[in-house]
Design a protein with these regions (language model features):
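Canonical Rossmann dinucleotide-binding motif of NAD(H)/NADP(H)-dependent dehydrogenases/reductases
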Residues: 3-38
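Active-site-adjacent segment of SDR/Rossmann-fold oxidoreductases
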Residues: 25, 31-32, 140, 156, ...
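Conserved amphipathic alpha-helix within the SDR
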Residues: 59, 63, 69-73, 77-91
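Substrate-binding pocket helix/loop in short-chain dehydrogenase/reductase
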Residues: 62, 107-108, 112-117
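A short, exposed helix-loop element centered on a Lys and neighboring polar residues
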Residues: 131-132, 176
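Residue(s) in the substrate-gating loop at a strand-loop-helix junction
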Residues: 151
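C-terminal helical subdomain
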Residues: 191, 209-300
Length: 301
């Protein structure tokens, strides 16, 4: 039997951990030996307000079970404060789970600039700020695990969520670039796109739908990706209800068009079936792999 995964000596910072997914992430890591900073503003699903109650409640659960944790209510847009609080309390940071977020759903034709900017500030800019503050410490100790949180809305799009969908797909672009930069320093970065009962999903899904989608079924994947044994990086995973799947980019073989006399709109139309044919598709996993068609055209440098 495989030895239990432990996180003794590790320190984790989990944002948005006062309830839902963040709470179960924090509880699981603490139960396996990690010291955890439970960050949460304590605001509602639409944002606004500060209340230490939700974060402190999770801390109380952890300490009652014999773990170590501290509550924090700083905004992720002030990421350095979260990281400083983690270092002040526990002396290091090893694991960062960017989970904080809220919804501001509105059809695009009714969307205000503030609806866009408020979602950007927390989901994307907030993830940047906290990760950017933690990054030098992860590099210095040559160890780090970062989890960014996406959504099916980011992968597939969803009505009334152009703001949220945009940030949630952008988060994975953030992950992919960080994975490239961090690998040499043993900083591994992955994205999860969870489907689970939470304060956010309760605003758009029924109680009956959410019954089998417990957040406890998501956190084991997040914790696995944070363990030193796991060497996965740059991955995107959908997870929920006891199911886990990995996604990757897929590209058709495409069509090489004659360029001697320039390329016309009609040339594109004539080649459209070939351009769109996914039989024999490729799965480029890096800039180098993605650039092969252009390298073939340009020839050796």
């Amino acid at each position: 039997m495989t030895a239990p995964f432990r996180y003794d000596g590790r320190v984790a910072l989990v944002t948005g951990a006062g309830g839902g997914l963040g709470r179960t992430h924090a509880l699981l890591l603490a139960a396996r030996g990690a010291k955890v900073v439970v960050n949460d503003l304590g605001s509602g699903p639409a944002g606004g307000g500060v209340d230490i109650g939700p974060a402190q409640k999770v801390v109380n659960e952890i300490t009652a079970a014999g773990g170590e944790a501290a509550a924090n209510t700083d905004s992720v847009t002030e990421g350095h404060r979260l990281v400083e609080a983690t270092l002040d309390r526990f002396g290091r940071i090893d694991i960062l789970i960017n989970n904080a977020g809220f919804l501001r759903d509105v059809a695009f034709h009714n969307m205000k600039e503030s609806d866009w900017n408020d979602i950007y500030q927390v989901h994307l800019y907030g993830a940047f700020r906290v990760t950017h503050a933690a990054w030098p410490h992860l590099r210095k100790q040559a160890f780090g695990r970062v989890i960014n949180t996406s959504s099916a809305a980011g992968i597939y799009g969803n009505f009334g969520q152009t703001n949220y969908s945009s940030m949630k797909l952008a988060v994975h672009g953030f992950t992919q670039a960080l994975a490239v930069e961090g690998r040499s320093k043993n900083i591994l970065v992955n994205t999860i796109a969870p489907a689970a009962d939470s304060r956010l999903t309760r605003t758009v899904m029924s109680e009956e739908q959410l019954k089998p989608m417990q957040p406890d079924y998501v956190s084991p994947l997040a914790a696995y990706l944070c363990h030193e044994k796991c060497q996965e990086t740059g991955g995107l995973f959908e997870v929920g209800g006891g199911w886990v799947g990995k996604l990757r980019w897929e590209r058709t073989l495409g069509a090489y068009l004659p360029t001697q006399n320039g390329i016309s709109i009609e040339d594109i139309d004539a080649a459209w079936t070939k351009i769109s044919d996914f039989s024999g598709a490729e799965h480029p996993g890096s800039m180098a792999e993605g650039g092969k068609p252009f390298a073939k055209i340009m020839g050796p440098g």
